[in-house]
């Protein structure tokens, strides 16, 4: 229902949703520009999606909602999040979809992307599931004419190190964001 309201209100364009398989474990990873990004990603598939989100959402007045929807609480101040990582692994090992932003926070800067954390690539490598990048561009405005999500083909990281995998994910998403803005990746 929330997705239906979102689509009506924001009028987003969705490209590449067929990249998300109808079954099996998947890690979705993309840029984070707005609090509604997870809802936007959710309208790309009929499958339930488990989202990694800052733990403060679980501690808020709406915490019950985030727990009910299978959101995974992440402590952004911690160096590591073994509980969140284990929970995400459990969902993936059960054949579910996990969505996270490697930026780990919303990007309010002039930079096209913030530096990536390693959670997405580590989860994908640990489970052997597809790592599917996406890029969100445009404005969250009523009946927007330019809000768009582009779901890209899975990236093959099987023969890459964690650092190389993260760099490939970063470059893939950055390339799509730059293309959408008509500029060259730098």
Predicted regions and their residues:
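Residue-level "edge-of-site" marker
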Residues: 18, 79, 137
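Non-catalytic C-terminal accessory region of glycerolipid acyltransferases
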Residues: 83-186
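Catalytic core of membrane glycerolipid acyltransferases/transacylases, capturing the structured
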Residues: 7, 22-79
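A generic structural signal for alpha->beta connector loops
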Residues: 9-11, 48, 68, 95, ...
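Structural motif corresponding to alpha-helix initiation and N-cap regions
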Residues: 14-17, 59, 82-85
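Short, basic, glycine/proline-bearing loop/turn elements
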Residues: 2, 69-75, 103-106
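A short, well-structured juxtamembrane/interface segment
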Residues: 3-24
